[in-house]
Amino acid sequence: LHLSLRRQRQMCIRDSLSGVNACPRAKCEEYLRLSIDMQEPVKPTEQLVRDLKAAGYKLYVLSNMSREFIDFLRRFPVYGLFDGEVVSCEEGVVKPEPEIYRRLLGRYGLDPAQTLFIDDRPANIAAAAALGIRGQLFDHSAPAATCDLLRRRLLPRK
């Protein structure tokens, strides 16, 4: 199932499944539920969020996740540590479009030069950099190593 970015902006996963004829609606809904239920936060990432928050950092979510996945993540206690969020399915714009970064900066009064954007897609990092935001690529194949790198970069040495 391939959707243009424009279409993705306007829908959630459940909406996109409405056009799938190859699988009965109930099966698609079950697949969606199981896909979401199998997800869990990456443990090193959870701890990094806690460490950064304890060090006084302001933390924000900038995400292209669907409404269903964002609603799922909001149930985890660690999500409550974030100071705000800009989520594409609620905004009608997606990364790497410059407007979504501008909304994050404007909504929360962030200085691009003092903002670090962590993402798993080089195109999203490049789009942020074009607006003066520093970036760090997150490597899902080595989450602990990426979190350690960020800890060394951002937290004072003990």
Model-derived features: where do they sit?
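Short, basic/glycine-rich phosphate-binding loops at helix/coil junctions
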Residues: 16-31, 84-85
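Asp-based, Mg2+/Mn2+-dependent phosphohydrolase catalytic module
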Residues: 66-67, 73-158
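Short, acidic loop-to-helix structural element flanking the phosphoryl-transfer center
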Residues: 25-60, 98
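Single conserved hydrophobic/aromatic residue that forms the stacking wall/gate
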Residues: 1-9, 13-15
